[in-house]
Amino acid sequence: MFTGTYRVRVDDKGRLAIPAAFRKQLPEGSFVSLSLDRVLAIYPPELWTALADSLLSPLQGPDQREVARTLYSLSEAFEPDGQGRIILRPEQRRLAEIGSPASVVVIGSGSRVEIWQEARWDSYSADAQGRFTESADRVNSTR
């Protein structure tokens, strides 16, 4: 399970050093992709496979095809270099509004890792923390 928050830099070549705590848990063949809320997500292979399989069906509608095409075209398997860095493609960075160089926030999000543009994370996090109790109450009421 991925937990924690780390502030790191994306260098001028688009390289991001994955925090060591996450790197230890990510197996070979993990994927980086665009996710919801204009963030990038790192998925272990088994989670990526489950997500990709959920988009495959013989009778896809136009929305499902669009989501599948966008997701697949913006996703890439990676192997960190010797310093634990991965390269975020320019198109991935553009859609997540991450420059190079840039400060980003890498968070554990349970089964995956998310990469946020720093100012957007700071705003989102402050708002979400302020609503935590009422959001948790709503989640619990639907169980």
Where are these regions (language model features)?
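Flexible "stalk/tail and boundary" regions
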Residues: 1-7, 12, 22-83, 90-143
